[in-house]
Amino acid sequence: MAKNTAIGIDLGTTYSCVGVFQHGKVEIIANDQGNRTTPSYVAFTDTERLIGDAAKNQVALNPQNTVFDAKRLIGRKFGDPVVQSDMKHWPFRVINDGDKPKVQVSYKGETKAFYPEEISSMVLTKMKEIAEAYLGHPVTNAVITVPAYFNDSQRQATKDAGVIAGLNVLRIINEPTAAAIAYGLDRTGKGERNVLIFDLGGGTFDVSILTIDDGIFEVEATAGDTHLGGEDFDNRLVNHFVEEFKRKHKKDISQNKRAVRRLRTACERAKRTLSSSTQASLEIDSLFEGIDFYTSITRARFEELCSDLFRSTLEPVEKALRDAKLDKAQIHDLVLVGGSTRIPKVQKLLQDFFNGRDLNKSINPDEAVAYGAAVQAAILMGDKSENVQDLLLLDVAPLSLGLETAGGVMTALIKRNSTIPTKQTQIFTTYSDNQPGVLIQVYEGERAMTRDNNLLGRFELSGIPPAPRGVPQIEVTFDIDANGILNVTATDKSTGKANKITITNDKGRLSKEEIERMVQEAEKYKAEDEVQRERVSAKNALESYAFNMKSAVEDEGLKGKISEADKKKVLDKCQEVISWLDANTLAEKDEFEHKRKELEQVCNPIISRLYQGAGGPGAGGFGAQAPKGGSGPGPTIEEVD
C-alpha cells in the first residue's frame, strides 16, 4: 500500500472513531482494546497521561484530572453561556485565560492548564496511532469531521488540534455529510433520493436532509440541538438513582464526585443493555459510606425518564423538512447515525413520525461518520478506485447573504440553504440624481431589514458618471466558493469600473446558537417584518412615481405639447409630495398610498391627455378629448429602485 494513505477521523464529543479506505473498501480500525470506537477522554495522573479507554476506565478514581467533552469547549470563549452552563456539570476545572477556556489538571505532581485544542489533539494523536498500528506505517493526511453547525472558529480550532497532533488536515467536513457519503457508496444508481440523516450521538444531535443523485450529494437543510445526546440520557438515569439512594438510605451522594462518577459508569452500561433487553441491573459495591447499591431498571421506566428528550428529537426533523421544503412523504431514506439511535424508543418515534417507514440501520451507527470521512480522504488523495471516482460533495450556506437597498431593506442574493459553491448577480441602480457612488453593505440573516441582520462587510463603488436617479446600472455579484469564502463585486456597467470585497468565514460569522436564534426570531418576527417591508415598498413606489412624473413633464420632447399651466400643476404637486416624503419618512403604508392616489388624480388626466393626443393634429386638439376626471388608465411606469 502506498505510504500516503489518508485516514478519516470522527472526532466525537464522547467517542471517536477512525477509518481508512484501501483495497476498494473502508476499514474501521479497532484500537488496542479491540474496540472500534475510542472514548474522547484524556486523563492525567501522578505518573502518566492516559488517552481513550485507559482514561475512561480510571475516571472514577481520578475525576478531577480526567478531561472529556473538549468538543464542547473548542473554538468557544470562556464567557460563552454554553461554556458557563457546561462547567457546572464537569468534575474537572475550567479556568479563564484571556477569555479563552483552559482545563486545569494536576499532572505528575504539577498544576497544568491545557487549551481545548490541546486536549482534542491528544485524542487525535491516539486515533492517528491506532491507524498507524493497523497500517504498519506513519500516517499524516486526514479528514476530520465536525457537527454541521460548527462555526468558523470551532472548525478552525478543530483544524488546529489536528495540526498539533501532527496531522495534515486535508479538509474539515460535516458529520452528516460524511454519513451521507458512507451511505451513498452503498446506494448508487437509484435516481435522485432524498435522505434524512438522524445523528444522535453522545453529546450532540444533528438532523440533515441530503439529496443524493448519481454520486452527487447536496445538503438541502440542517438542524439540530448542540446539547442533546447519550450523556443527557445518562444524566436522567443518574438523577433517578441519586433520588432512589436518598429514599432507600436517606443519604445524598450527589456531592461526592467519585460516587456520582461510578454511578454514571453503571448507568451508561445499563442504558446500553436496555437497547437489547427490557431490564438491566446495577450492582455497585460500596458506592457511598460503605453502602452497596444493588438495583435495577426497566426499559419502560428509562423511556419514561427520558420521554421529553426523546420527543424533542422530532422538532429538528420537522424544521429540517420545512427548510428543505419537503413533505415527510418525499423522504426516500432514513439513516440512523450515532450510538444513541440504537435506543428502541428513539427508533420507534422516528418510524412513527414517518408513518411506519423502515429505518436504514445497515451502517453501524457509531462508525458511519468515520466511514464517510475515510472515503472523502481517499477522494482528496486522488484515489482512482471507481467506487469513489465520481463522488461529489456539495454543502449549503447556513444563512441568506445579501445587501442593503433603499430604506434599509435586506435584498438577498444567495438564499439560506443554497448549495455552495454558487454565484448570483443582480442589477441595482442609484437612489438620487447625480449620485457619485454607491455603498455596498453585505449582510447575512433572515430578517427583512438589514438592521436586524449581521453586517459582514462594506465597500464603496465611486466614480459613477453624473446621471438621473435610476439610470446607472450597477451589477452586483455574490460568489461563494466551496470553503464558504464570499466574494462580492460591484461593477458600473457604463464605465466598467469595479470594486470588490472578500469576506472569509472568520470575519464575525455567527455561531450555531446565533444562527438558530436568528432563524427562530425570523419566524417570530416575520409578521412585523412583512408590515415594515410593505411600508418601505409603498414609500419607494410613491417616490419613484413622483420623480417619474416630474421628469415626464420636463421632457424636452414634450415642449409645446403640454400647456405651461398643466406642467406647473404637475411639477408643484410632485414637489409638494417630494417635500412631504422628506419630512415624513416614517409614515405608515396607507399614508404613502393615499399620497400616491392624490398625486395620480392630478397627474393622470394630464399625462393621459398627452399620450392620447400624441398622434393628433398639433397641440390645439388636446382640450377637446380630455377625459373627465382622468378615467383613462394612467401610464404604467416601471419602478426602478
Curated annotation (Swiss-Prot):
**In its keyword annotation, does this UniProt entry include Kinase?**
no
Q: Which organism is it from?
A: Bos mutus grunniens
> Main site of residence?
cytoplasm
In the record, which positions carry N-acetylalanine? A2
Give the residue ranges for region: Nucleotide-binding domain (NBD): 2-386
Residues annotated as signal peptide: none
- Reported modifications of this chain: In response to cellular stress, acetylated at Lys-77 by NA110 and then gradually deacetylated by HDAC4 at later stages. Acetylation enhances its chaperone activity and also determines whether it will function as a chaperone for protein refolding or degradation by controlling its binding to co-chaperones HOPX and STUB1. The acetylated form and the non-acetylated form bind to HOPX and STUB1 respectively. Acetylation also protects cells against various types of cellular stress.
Any Pfam family from its record, for instance, is HSP70
Q: What is known of its domains?
A: The N-terminal nucleotide binding domain (NBD) (also known as the ATPase domain) is responsible for binding and hydrolyzing ATP. The C-terminal substrate-binding domain (SBD) (also known as peptide-binding domain) binds to the client/substrate proteins. The two domains are allosterically coupled so that, when ATP is bound to the NBD, the SBD binds relatively weakly to clients. When ADP is bound in the NBD, a conformational change enhances the affinity of the SBD for client proteins.
> Which GO BP annotation is one of this protein's?
positive regulation of microtubule nucleation
Which intervals carry biased composition (Gly residues)? Answer: 617-633
Q: Which CDD domains match?
A: ASKHA_NBD_HSP70_HSPA1
Locate the N6-acetyllysine modifications and list their residues.
K77, K108, K246, K348
Tissues where the protein occurs: Testis-specific.
Locate the N6,N6,N6-trimethyllysine modifications and list their residues: K561
Residues binding ATP are 12-15, 71, 202-204, 268-275, 339-342
Q: What induces it?
A: By heat shock.
Function summary: Molecular chaperone implicated in a wide variety of cellular processes, including protection of the proteome from stress, folding and transport of newly synthesized polypeptides, activation of proteolysis of misfolded proteins and the formation and dissociation of protein complexes. Plays a pivotal role in the protein quality control system, ensuring the correct folding of proteins, the re-folding of misfolded proteins and controlling the targeting of proteins for subsequent degradation. This is achieved through cycles of ATP binding, ATP hydrolysis and ADP release, mediated by co-chaperones.
Q: What is this protein called?
A: Heat shock 70 kDa protein 1B
PTM N6,N6-dimethyllysine: list the residues: K561
Q: Does the keyword Cytoplasm apply?
A: yes
- MF-aspect GO terms: ATP binding; ATP-dependent protein folding chaperone
Q: Its quaternary structure?
A: May be an auxiliary component of the CatSper complex. Identified in a IGF2BP1-dependent mRNP granule complex containing untranslated mRNAs. Interacts with CHCHD3, DNAJC7, IRAK1BP1, PPP5C and TSC2. Interacts with TERT; the interaction occurs in the absence of the RNA component, TERC, and dissociates once the TERT complex has formed. Interacts with METTL21A. Interacts with TRIM5 (via B30.2/SPRY domain). Interacts with PRKN. Interacts with FOXP3. Interacts with NOD2; the interaction enhances NOD2 stability. Interacts with DNAJC9 (via J domain).
By its UniProt entry, which SUPFAM superfamilies does this protein fall under?
Actin-like ATPase domain, Heat shock protein 70kD (HSP70), C-terminal subdomain, Heat shock protein 70kD (HSP70), peptide-binding domain
Chain spans, region Disordered: 617-641
